[in-house]
Curated annotation (Swiss-Prot):
Coiled-coil intervals, chain numbering: 98-123
GO cellular component annotations of the record: mitochondrial large ribosomal subunit; mitochondrion
Protein name: Large ribosomal subunit protein mL38
Localization, UniProt: Mitochondrion
InterPro entries: PEBP, PEBP-like_sf, PEBP_euk
Gene3D superfamilies to which the protein is assigned, alphabetical: PEBP-like (3.90.280.10)
Species name: Rattus norvegicus
Gene: Mrpl38
Family: Belongs to the phosphatidylethanolamine-binding protein family. Mitochondrion-specific ribosomal protein mL38 subfamily.
Transit peptide, start-end: 1-26
Keywords: Coiled coil, Mitochondrion, Ribonucleoprotein, Ribosomal protein, Transit peptide
Assembly mode: Component of the mitochondrial ribosome large subunit (39S) which comprises a 16S rRNA and about 50 distinct proteins.
Amino acid sequence: MAAPWWRAAFSVTGRCRGISTSASLSRRTPPLGPMPNEDIDVSNLERLEKYRSFERYRRRAEQEAHAPHWWRTYREYFLKETDPKDRINIGLPPPRVSRTQKLQERKRFLQELRANSEEERAARLRTASIPLEAVRAEWERTCGPYHKQRLAEYYGLYRDLFHGATFVPWVPLHVAYALGEEDLIPVYHGNEVTPTEASQAPEVTYEADKDSLWTLLFINLDGHLLEPDAEYLHWLVTNIPSNRVAEGQESCPYLPPFPARGSGFHRFAFLLFKQDKPINFSEDTRPSPCYQLAQRTFHTLDFYKKHQEAMTPAGLAFFQCRWDDSVTHTFHQLLDMREPVFEFVRPPPYHPKQKRFPHQQPLRYLDRYRDSHEPTYGIY
């Protein structure tokens, strides 16, 4: 007896699907190495060794995360990070402090704190006040320079200024813009400062020896209009005696920030270099006033290579800045040029090839492929 027509058709369709699946699986190549967790026998989970503590699990997870694998992560595909051990440190050496002296100082501080009954009573009653200035001074003296270095690496300052070379800013650099007669806008390490607030030269302070010489540099890393790998020099003060910036030689007068409209946030950095001796900066001197952007084109790496035998980077402070109304005044009145305006053109959204019979698709599926913006929803 012949089989029904629908049964024969089903058998043919099943065979065709099986052939197609087998053909697609045959094109798959085996992995280049063991897959994650392939060495774990999951047939009997109760017999597996338990961690029994979160700390033991954390150590094992960190060990596996840092172990070399045959595959690459998303970050390794797009970011070519160098080993921190291979980076060149161009900064000052760390201050030498005796380990015994540090332990004795901590022990003495704890003994004084325990002997103070008023501090103990205030802490118990939750009325104790913490001197934030003393906390910040202690932070800048101990772990603050390393935190600043990590922030600078996060914002890509070392990568774009020194092509990967790094340094620890051991000298605390304090920069503040005057806003009125009493208010100050501080520059920390990545905070936002508007061009209006930075229209005048800031107040720069740092601790220095009496007979030392310094160089202060203020640049814009992202604002060059013609060269993508160049910076704009906004301020350069050289041969500064001790911490008296006003008595230094102003090799380049101060120019307010002018991030172009539509270009987003720009990174502005203050770099402090310690000089070993007086340096002749005649080749780096700009005329005063200097309102030609071609004369303010600057390469920090070339500047450092030229004088690296006599100066060392020691301090760092930077902020982010974006366009406001004062930038228009800077372009028109100071730079005497038309203001450039940028606009980000988003790429068109990707849509797969339209199907003639979109099975199990909503009615608004057709809106993706219509030339007009008139929706189909509510028409039919």
